[in-house]
Amino acid sequence: MKLSFKSRTSTRPTRLAALAAACCVTAVLGCASSPNSAALDQITDGVVKTSFRDQGMVKVDRLVQDDSNRECSIADATGKPVSSERAKQIEEANLRTVKWPSDGKFLGDWREGEKIAQSGRGLTWTDDAKMANGGNCYNCHQITKEEISFGTIGPSLYNYGKIRGVSDPNSAAAKPIVEYTWGKIWNSKAYNACSNMPRAGHAGILNEAQVRHVVGLLLDPQSPVNK
């Protein structure tokens, strides 16, 4: 059928109706062809796998999540928090992975701890696998009042030991806080199932000696953190 456009007013309602019908059909087809959540996850996995490659010391196996990260990622994506019961199970599982100091000494040199907290080097494809990693702690926390450049994703750690009443880190009274601090740095998910804090010791970001120095930075009464 050939339409005549001699009269604009006579054909306008017809054209509007046709346009509306086309929009409805497009909407219906769009809804019918939209992938479900599982399909979207599969598509995303495919995109991720084809978008990254091994380079230098960095391997694509870093993209493989363990159960803790996977469950928390799903909870974040769906907006449905992990149940309190499941969160407790995740925390207990991660607590079992905490490696306590082999020599029984929890505190190291706070000066070395400050260097580690300041450094964000390590674990990138331009880094040497033999170099010591930094903790990059200032990226998320205020730690000393001298450093004015810090992130706020995590809570301020300034006066960390002082406000917790730790005057002698080697005392029996300070033991619970000292052990908690070590465990939190080693594997943060042992105390908060879906913590955003990197599991520094568990993930091999920091070694035992480095964790000891960072604990010293936070708890040594002589550290600028507690002044």
Annotate each predicted stretch with a short phrase.
Residues 2-20:
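Bacterial N-terminal signal peptides that target proteins for export
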Residues 2-5, 25-123, 184, 217-227:
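Post-cleavage N-terminal segment of exported redox proteins
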Residues 24-28, 145-148:
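Residue-level signal for alpha-helical transmembrane segments in multi-pass membrane proteins
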Residues 43, 48-51, 108-112, 138-209, ...:
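Extracytoplasmic electron-transfer domains, predominantly the class I c-type cytochrome c fold
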Residues 101-102, 126, 200-203:
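Generic anion/oxyanion-binding catalytic loop in active/binding sites
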Residues 123-126, 146-150, 224-225:
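Secretory-pathway/luminal and periplasmic proteins that interact with or process carbohydrate-rich
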Residues 125-136:
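Local sequence-structure signature of Cys/Sec-based thiol-disulfide redox active-site neighborhoods
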